[in-house]
């Protein structure tokens, strides 16, 4: 809802374009579908993209979760797999279609595995006649010895127990050897699955490589204490693409609360300098200080883990905290009210989420050709 947020600000323009290059020397941003945009100040928050540790061919056989379109692909993939399983007479093919593999045991992977298991085992429970959704298989793959590695051991163990209660198979100490069409090869087994979801690795947006900057191993930009690009004080880099140790000596994590705080910090600097009608030396700018408001991950219905101000929560209380935080960060009262009502309906009726999906054009063409062939015969 970016346009609606700024609908009363006639001095704000919104462009839905792809950034091709950032020319900091000429203070210009090159876009894919329109003329370049010149700037006086620039805030870069392009975010991360999926990384496959040098195995880029894995991207063809798995779906990441870094964009809305990828989220839609996951929904389409899972729902269509069960429709195909319902129509199949082959038990092994049914088993494969009803198996989902989530690679990566971080917060995103844990939440995804729990959501798919609840959807397929409980929501689908009475929807099909030829298959039994309770026989669904969800495998969460993690190379380390525990999931939620950045959380405490207590929270990690709690999340593991809750996932197992939901029927999720958690494969620890299981680095991925290969991802092929319809299967994932681990150290000691090969899992055949229709839905393969990648949440294991990220790297900085490749557009950043056009910048004259120092990068870390993940491609993040090493920034100044005020989040500006070294040598270019009018350019700020925020969010998970910034490699920054704050004034307190703590590494700023690549999470949304940190990105929001960094954005506000950069905006205050810009506002102050515009008001003074001059740029200030970096040394006189206030350094960024990260306020850790805690971490949390939802696992399923009434199940979550949270660590806030040194306190650890799990179960229903942590789940309510997770809901509250996500409501707070929504824009506008109407959006908050609508989401709250949707959540309440889903919780009471156990009918979460929209289950309408469309097929990719290629699959639609295949089905149409099959229909025409049957008609001709």
Can you say where each PLM-predicted feature lies in the sequence?
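Rossmann-like dinucleotide-binding cores of NAD(P)H-dependent redox enzymes
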Residues: 96-100, 112-174
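Short, well-ordered coil/turn residues at beta-beta hairpins
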Residues: 32, 45-46, 174, 199-200, ...
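FAD-binding core/adjacent interface of flavoenzyme oxidoreductases
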Residues: 12-101, 186, 197
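N-terminal Rossmann-like dinucleotide/flavin-binding domain of flavoprotein oxidoreductases
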Residues: 1-41, 149-169
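C-terminal, flexible cofactor-proximal segment of oxidoreductases
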Residues: 267-377
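FAD-site-proximal beta/loop scaffold in flavoenzymes
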Residues: 61-90, 182-185, 190-262, 268
């Amino acid at each position: 809802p970016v346009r609606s947020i700024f609908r009363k600000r006639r001095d704000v323009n919104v462009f839905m374009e792809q950034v091709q290059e950032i020319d900091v020397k000429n203070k210009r941003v090159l876009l894919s579908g329109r003329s370049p945009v010149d700037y006086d100040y620039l805030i870069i928050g392009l975010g991360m993209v999926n990384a496959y540790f040098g195995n880029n061919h894995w991207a063809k056989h798995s779906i990441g979760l870094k964009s809305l379109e990828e989220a839609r692909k996951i929904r389409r993939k899972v729902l269509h797999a069960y429709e195909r399983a319902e129509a199949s007479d082959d038990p092994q093919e049914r088993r494969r279609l009803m198996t989902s593999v989530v690679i990566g045991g971080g917060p995103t992977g844990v939440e995804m595995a729990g959501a798919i298991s609840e959807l397929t085992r409980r929501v689908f429970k009475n929807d099909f006649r030829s298959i039994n959704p309770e026989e669904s298989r969800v495998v969460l793959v993690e190379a380390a010895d525990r999931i939620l590695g950045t959380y405490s051991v207590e929270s990690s163990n709690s999340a593991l127990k809750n996932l197992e209660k939901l029927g999720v198979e958690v494969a620890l100490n299981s680095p991925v050897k290969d991802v092929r069409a319809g299967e994932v090869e681990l150290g000691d087994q090969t899992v055949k699955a229709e839905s393969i979801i990648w949440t294991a690795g990220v790297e900085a947006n490749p557009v950043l490589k056009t910048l004259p900057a120092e990068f870390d191993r993940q491609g993040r930009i090493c920034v100044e204490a005020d989040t500006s690009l070294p040598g270019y004080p009018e350019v700020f880099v925020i969010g998970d693409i910034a490699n920054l140790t704050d004034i307190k000596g703590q590494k700023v994590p690549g999470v949304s609360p940190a990105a929001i705080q960094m954005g506000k910090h950069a905006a205050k600097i810009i506002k102050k300098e515009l008001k003074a009608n001059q740029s200030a030396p970096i040394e006189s700018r206030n350094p960024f200080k990260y306020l850790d408001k805690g971490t949390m991950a939802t696992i399923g219905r009434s199940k979550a883990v949270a660590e806030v101000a040194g306190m650890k929560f799990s179960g229903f209380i942590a789940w309510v905290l997770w809901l509250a935080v996500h409501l707070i960060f929504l824009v506008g009262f109407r959006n908050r009210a609508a989401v709250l009502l949707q959540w309440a309906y889903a919780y009471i009726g156990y009918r979460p989420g929209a289950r309408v999906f469309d097929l990719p054009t290629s699959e639609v063409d295949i089905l149409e050709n099959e229909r025409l062939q049957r008609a001709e015969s």
